[in-house]
């Protein structure tokens, strides 16, 4: 029963967050482009997400004549479900208890598993199947080309992201996300500074992994009309849409855990520790989401060859170099996990 309550406690706010992330994005881009953004439905346009949801609910779901109906319907469901189940291992805070004179950190999470990092990477990589199936089952050249682009893009950047995550694991000595945050909090400050450049690479890779601007080539309007979801309408289209924005929030949460200290305040000041850890965690995610939106409004789209070159010829060598550099520095200074940290 407690597990069910915890799931609802996370899923309901997450779904509302996804809905209002769309509103937040439209408002921010409107302000950057000197427009009002949503302002008609409800005060300040706050009811716009509900109006959009009702519109999509009452529209007729159209299935192309030559489409594979079962796979066509399952693809958006797969994408959306995978975007949600990853949150089972994401910690939102921690409770510190003292046992036998030692402080033990207990993360506030649905499933406190010791391989949380591997779980996140595994489930995230499965998201590509929903996109590939959507493009193939639509029997549309535009949709299929968009899905192929998305597959190549996500696979290319997952290599760099995996190496960057390996760097974080080497630094902390654990695959448990809650323990990772607690370990990083107790590390010397210079290690965090050394990790910041690779954190920037990780965030840019997130933009490509989530098919966000300036790497939204799978749905480049000028070339592919709308990409892999061009044949979708009504709620199947909405599920793709919700899955994309849920992955944005998930990526921001992972960036927060790996590089921004999780639920701990940015500075080790006693006054800042009076603010609940959940608030710090949410504030950091909101800041990263703002950068997601800001990037969309200000940076032009990359060409496909530029995207591939950036992933394989720039980010991959940097990631490999940083794994070697971090390992060597930690070993030389005696800060490897289990060697005096």
UniProtKB/Swiss-Prot annotation:
UniProt GO MF annotations: NADH dehydrogenase activity; oxidoreductase activity, acting on NAD(P)H, quinone or similar compound as acceptor; quinone binding
GO CC field: plasma membrane
Record-level GO BP terms: aerobic respiration
Keywords for this protein: Cell membrane, Membrane, NAD, Quinone, Translocase, Transmembrane, Transmembrane helix, Ubiquinone
Enzymatic class: translocase
Location relative to the cell: Cell membrane
Pfam families: NADHdh
Subunit structure: NDH-1 is composed of 14 different subunits. Subunits NuoA, H, J, K, L, M, N constitute the membrane sector of the complex.
Protein name (database record): NADH-quinone oxidoreductase subunit H
Gene: nuoH
